[in-house]
Each structure stands twice: as structure tokens, then as C-alpha cells.
Amino acid sequence: MAVTKLVLVRHGESQWNNENRFTGWYDVDLSEKGVGEAKAAGKLLKDEGFSFDFAYTSVLKRAIHTLWNVLDELDQAWLPVEKSWKLNERHYGALQGLNKAETAEKYGDEQVKQWRRGFAVTPPELTKDDERYPGHDPRYAKLTDAELPQTESLALTIDRVVPYWNDTILPRVKSGERVIVAAHGNSLRALVKYLDNLGEEEILELNIPTGVPLVYEFDENFKPIKRYYLGNADEIAAKAAAVANQGKAK
């Protein structure tokens, strides 16, 4: 029986990843390193024999440009793509733009770990008159007030990612199409938690590295039977550890 596969990839390193700043819905681009990571992910997928029928990404350019570079390496730049805000990074509220290590020095490592990785913990929220509030951004003009976040926990991120998975992405996977999703650390953590039924403590320790393809294999009932990264295991572990350490005081 043919195994159904799904590929997830977190965007390559962004300019604010490089500066160790909380990014959330702020629309920063890839760093030079991030472009290289995205191209390397595409080459790795090509070398492993992957090709796709459809792609999904967020409305943030670090994920969009990652997908562009991946598909370019696969010689599939023509692939149909759907962009949705529901795949955006978790909204980090008033933390957006702040340096993570400096924030940890001010509030403590454990508080920042909870803000970054806690399941139901929300960072301090933005006010609606703050220029960072997404209601001021034309790409979100059709969203209702209830849909526009002032801050988000991982639990709230799950509330938008999982219905999008079930209603939009999964039916395409079930139809036999080969799908790739280029998104963000926390929108992908939300999906992994749901697919693998991870507990709150397990998801607290899950860190997804930038620019590394994550492959899911599903059984005939579309239940996950295997999840694995493509690439060198030691390098991937080091990248995941670096993600975990971003929120610690220096």
C-alpha cells in the first residue's frame, strides 16, 4: 500500500530570528542565511525524490519566500499555492520586536519560556491603537474584530490552525495530492500537537528548527504513523537546541 506523505517546513532564518527578537505577525523577510536554508531544504527534498501537487503557506513573507525558494529548487515554481493568515505565526502581542534575551534578563528565563512555549499562556497584549495591531494592516482587512489577535497563546493558535487543517488541507491530502506546508514555528507546533496528540508538557519542549523539512507518513485512515526530519540528525538537534536557547538571558 502506498504511504501518504505530508511535508511541513518552518521558514528559514528571518532577519529578526538573527537578531533574536520576538516576531509574531510582524512581516520581516528572510536573512541571507535563511534564504540558504530554504534553498537547502528544496535541494534535500529533490534529492529524496519529493515533488508536490499543491502548497500552503501563511501571508507573511518569510514563509512565502521560503516556499518560493523550496519550489524553485524542485523546479516547481509553477505549483498552485494557497496563502492563509490561519497559518501565520502565533501573535506575540506587546513582545513583538523585543529582544528575547533582554526580555529574559528583565522578567526571568522561566517567564519567557512560558510566554514562548507555554500552552495556554498569553504574552502581554497589544492595544488596538498600537501600530503593531494587525487591524491596521490591509492584508487583514476582511477579518472580524474577533479574528484579529492582540496576543495569542499556543492554545489560541491551535484554534485557528486545526480547523484550517481539517477543512482545507486534509481534504486535499485525502484526495491523493502531495502537499507541502511552509509556515512558522508555532503554527507548525500547533499542528504537530494535534496530529500527534501531544500533551501540554510534551509540546512545551518541542522546538522546530528553521528550514528543515519535516515529513509525516499517514496510514489508510490518515492517522500519523511516522514523523521525521530530512537531513543530518546531529545538525538538526543542534538547530532545535538553539531555538530553545533563544529565550534565555545571556
Curated annotation (Swiss-Prot):
Similarity field: Belongs to the phosphoglycerate mutase family. BPG-dependent PGAM subfamily.
NCBIfam families reported in the protein's UniProt record: pgm_1 (TIGR01258), PRK14115.1 (NF010713)
Keyword Isomerase appears in the UniProt entry: yes
GO molecular function: phosphoglycerate mutase activity
EC number: 5.4.2.11
GO biological process per UniProt: gluconeogenesis; glycolytic process
Keywords (A to Z) from UniProt: Gluconeogenesis, Glycolysis, Isomerase
Coiled coil (residue ranges): none
Superkingdom in the source lineage: Bacteria
Assembly information from the UniProt record: Homodimer.
CDD domains xrefs: HP_PGM_like
Job of this protein: Catalyzes the interconversion of 2-phosphoglycerate and 3-phosphoglycerate.
Protein's name according to its UniProt entry: 2,3-bisphosphoglycerate-dependent phosphoglycerate mutase
Residue numbers annotated as active site: 11 (tele-phosphohistidine intermediate), 89 (proton donor/acceptor)
Annotated site residue numbers, Transition state stabilizer: 184
InterPro entries: His_Pase_superF_clade-1 (IPR013078), His_PPase_superfam (IPR029033), PG/BPGM_mutase_AS (IPR001345), Phosphogly_mut1 (IPR005952)
Organism of this sequence: Enterobacter sp. (strain 638)
